[in-house]
């Protein structure tokens, strides 16, 4: 298969994919990879396969194609294509919740040589690295990466990247319970889709709507949350986007749980958990399990609650997510308090505070915790987070966290 035929087949596959003929598109791209003698064409076909398998939630296959793409890039001796392939490797590891590996590949990308095209990749690399750090509950590092990605998006006038970064920032602030910002950023993403996204994939609209739904739910605006989530789910079903379907089912279940309808919540949690397990999203599984545990807790079924929390803890520990571990310890406290097991209760109180220390989830001005209740946060240029009200009363005195870390102990 020569250069012209390779190009024609790739374009044919893209047209089929956009028309939701996914199976036919995958078959064509696979044939290009197997039969084409032209390395740039094979590289591009592998890129199409990577994107398609990512959107379907087939992350193991995505990673396999990313490895093949990196080998093709090395054969071509093209540093920019090597960077692109390494970015896809990073994304694959991130999707499989192998966050440290994802960070390592991102750092390799940022340290690689290349021309103007590599600079365009840097924004996407920073976004992937931020998502990986968020998966590890390294909030300051995640925010630093997201802000860098946003600067690249603005500098390159890359509205698609800006849209994706805004969604990640929405997820970031949902976790830290600044629900005003958690809603602001996906709303900004939705505005970008409305203003610039006429020719974009519908996944951008679906993604922004899902993150809006998550924020609305946290704000107690259940009707708005349901409406946004239904819109997102409709697109996810239409495009066979299994990862987004799992997230929407989780959101639907959370809405029903908030409305005290455990009978409707549990089947949706189970459906979400099945998809999360199928696609290999271990962190997603842990999130679902914690919320199932809350249902059993409401029903006063402590043995069931305990079993589910233990599974969530194991998954969170395996992927290195400290925030989910903290939430698990919090649930353990409630369970053991109900059971009257004082020693086990004390053990988990200690572990809870250890997680807080590890994540540095304290305001450096007032000393109170960050992320335990809905409150407005503000980041300084160094990406350290504080309560907004504390910064407003502190004045322009610089970052107390940075000042503390720069003071070195003297010799005694």
Swiss-Prot record:
Which of the residues bear the PTM Phosphotyrosine?
A: 196
Q: Which InterPro entries does this chain map to?
A: Postsynaptic, Postsynaptic_CS, RAPsyn, Rapsyn_myristoylation/link_N, TPR-like_helical_dom_sf, TPR_rpt, Znf_RING, Znf_RING/FYVE/PHD
Report if keyword Cell membrane is assigned.
Answer: yes
Q: Where in the cell is it found?
A: Cell membrane; Postsynaptic cell membrane; Cytoplasm, Cytoskeleton
Matches recorded under SUPFAM superfamilies: RING/U-box (SSF57850), TPR-like (SSF48452)
The record's annotation in Pfam families points to: Rapsyn_N (PF10579), TPR_12 (PF13424), zf-RING_2 (PF13639)
Q: Which keywords does this Swiss-Prot/TrEMBL entry list?
A: Cell membrane, Cytoplasm, Cytoskeleton, Lipoprotein, Membrane, Metal-binding, Myristate, Phosphoprotein, Postsynaptic cell membrane, Repeat, Synapse, TPR repeat, Zinc, Zinc-finger
Q: Mention one GO biological process in which this protein takes part, according to its record.
A: synaptic transmission, cholinergic
Q: Which Gene3D superfamilies does the entry link to?
A: Tetratricopeptide repeat domain, Zinc/RING finger domain, C3HC4 (zinc finger)
Where would I find the RING-type zinc fingers in this protein? 363-403
- What CDD domains does UniProt report for this protein, alphabetically? RING-H2_Rapsyn (cd16478)
Ranges occupied by TPR repeats = 6-39, 83-116, 123-156, 163-196, 206-239, 246-279, 286-319
What family does this belong to? Belongs to the RAPsyn family.
User: Any idea which residues bear Phosphoserine here?
Assistant: 405
One example of the protein's molecular function in GO is:
protein-membrane adaptor activity
Can you quote the domain comment?
A: A cysteine-rich region homologous to part of the regulatory domain of protein kinase C may be important in interactions of this protein with the lipid bilayer.
Task: Provide GO CC annotations from the record.
Answer: cytoplasm; cytoskeleton; neuromuscular junction; postsynaptic membrane
The annotated topology with respect to the bilayer is: Peripheral membrane protein
Job description of the protein: Postsynaptic protein required for clustering of nicotinic acetylcholine receptors (nAChRs) at the neuromuscular junction. It may link the receptor to the underlying postsynaptic cytoskeleton, possibly by direct association with actin or spectrin.
Write the protein's name. Answer: 43 kDa receptor-associated protein of the synapse
Q: At which residues does the record annotate a lipid attachment of kind N-myristoyl glycine? A: 2
């Amino acid at each position: 298969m020569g250069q012209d035929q390779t190009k024609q087949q790739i374009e044919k596959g893209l047209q089929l994919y956009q028309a939701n003929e996914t199976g036919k598109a995958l078959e064509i791209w696979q044939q290009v990879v197997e039969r084409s003698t032209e390395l740039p064409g094979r590289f591009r076909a592998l890129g199409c396969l990577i994107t398609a398998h990512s959107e379907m939630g087939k992350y193991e296959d995505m990673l396999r194609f990313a490895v093949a793409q990196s080998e093709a890039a090395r054969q071509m001796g093209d540093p920019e294509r090597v960077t692109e392939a390494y970015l896809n490797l990073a994304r694959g590891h991130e999707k499989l919740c192998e966050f440290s590996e994802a960070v390592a590949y991102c750092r390799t990308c940022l340290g690689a040589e290349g021309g103007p095209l590599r600079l365009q990749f840097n924004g996407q690399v920073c976004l992937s690295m931020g998502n990986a750090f968020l998966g590890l509950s390294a909030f300051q590092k995640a925010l630093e990466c997201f802000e860098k990605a946003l600067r690249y998006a603005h500098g390159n006038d890359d509205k698609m990247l800006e849209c994706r970064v805004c969604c990640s920032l929405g997820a970031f602030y949902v976790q830290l319970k600044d629900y005003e910002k958690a809603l602001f950023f996906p709303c900004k993403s939705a505005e970008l889709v409305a203003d610039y996204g006429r020719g974009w994939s519908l996944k951008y609209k679906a993604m922004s709507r899902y993150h809006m739904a998550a924020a609305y739910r946290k704000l107690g605006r259940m009707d708005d949350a349901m409406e946004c989530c239904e819109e997102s789910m409709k697109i996810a079903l239409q495009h066979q986007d299994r990862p987004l379907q799992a997230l929407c089912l989780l959101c639907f279940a959370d809405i029903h749980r908030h409305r005290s309808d455990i009978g409707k919540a549990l089947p949706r949690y189970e459906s979400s958990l099945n998809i999360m397990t199928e696609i290999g999203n271990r962190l997603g599984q842990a999130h679902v399990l914690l919320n199932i545990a809350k249902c059993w807790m409401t029903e006063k079924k402590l043995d069931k609650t305990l079993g589910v929390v233990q599974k969530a803890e194991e998954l969170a520990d395996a992927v290195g997510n400290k925030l989910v571990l903290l939430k698990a310890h919090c649930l353990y406290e409630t369970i053991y308090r109900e059971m009257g097991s004082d020693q086990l209760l004390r053990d988990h109180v200690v572990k809870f505070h250890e997680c807080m220390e590890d994540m540095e989830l304290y305001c450096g001005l007032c000393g109170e915790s960050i992320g335990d209740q809905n409150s407005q946060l503000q980041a300084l240029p160094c990406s350290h987070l504080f309560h907004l009200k504390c910064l407003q009363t502190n004045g322009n005195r610089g970052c107390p966290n940075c000042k503390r870390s720069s003071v070195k102990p003297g010799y005694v």
